[in-house]
A protein has these predicted regions:
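Charged, compositionally biased N-terminal leader segments and the immediate start
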Residues: 1-3
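C-terminal helix-cap and adjacent tail motif
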Residues: 5-18, 139-171
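Alpha-helix/helix-capping structural signal
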Residues: 11, 54, 120-123
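Glycine/small-residue-rich phosphate/adenosyl-binding loop
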Residues: 24-31, 35-96
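Short Asp/Glu-rich motifs
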Residues: 25, 52, 126-127, 133, ...
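Small-aliphatic-rich amphipathic alpha-helix that forms the alpha element of a beta-alpha
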Residues: 33, 76, 84-128, 141
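Short secondary-structure junction motifs
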Residues: 42-45, 109, 138
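A glycine-rich helix N-cap at a beta->alpha junction
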Residues: 67-77, 130-153
Length: 171
């Protein structure tokens, strides 16, 4: 798939086929996160690829919106150092947003769906993943082949009209 087609085809997938995602594809998706830009090239992140069904089921309970993780072929946990500094947290989470989007596009390019989730229960998430103290599991990204329909460019996405959100020169 070409980049523009991947951008147009990407959507949040919350229901997955039972087909496993090949390790090479999971590694490529994670590499997209590794290649994402970060503030001052700090790379305050780590990524944990999870394919074990028991771990996926356990992770689905760390946030009320993470139920889809249980049915995913895999999940990628996005981990950052714990900080009390608001500016550092803001920058780190912005960087994770870029890494997440890079992964969603890399996955879409392969015909693989993704669905993101926050993490509420840090202690539980750290225990499931073996994440050391001093780090937070910020987000989860469910990964798998869509159960409903393949990824294809969406002609009319459910979005606010483009001319309402794009401004030139001034608001």
């Amino acid at each position: 798939m070409q980049t523009w087609d991947a951008i147009r085809a990407r959507r949040n997938v919350r229901s997955y086929q039972t087909t496993p995602v090949p390790d090479a594809d999971l590694n490529r998706i994670a590499e997209a996160a590794w290649r994402a830009p970060s503030a001052s090239n700090r790379q305050h992140w780590d990524f944990v690829i999870v394919t074990d069904p028991d771990q996926l089921r356990a992770l689905s309970a760390v946030w009320r919106g993470a139920g889809h993780i249980a049915g995913a072929a895999a999940a990628i946990a996005l981990v950052v150092p714990t900080t009390d500094d608001d500016r550092t947290r803001l920058i780190d989470y912005y960087d994770l947003g870029q890494a997440t989007y890079a992964m969603t596009l890399a996955a879409a390019d392969l015909g693989i769906g993704t669905g993101h989730s926050s993490v509420g229960d840090q202690d539980r998430a750290r225990k499931i993943l073996g994440v050391p103290a001093g780090h937070d599991v910020a987000f989860l990204l469910g990964v798998g082949y869509p159960a409903d329909r393949p990824l294809r460019p969406i002609a009319k996405p459910s979005r606010r009209p483009l001319d309402e959100v794009i401004h030139h020169g001034r608001w």
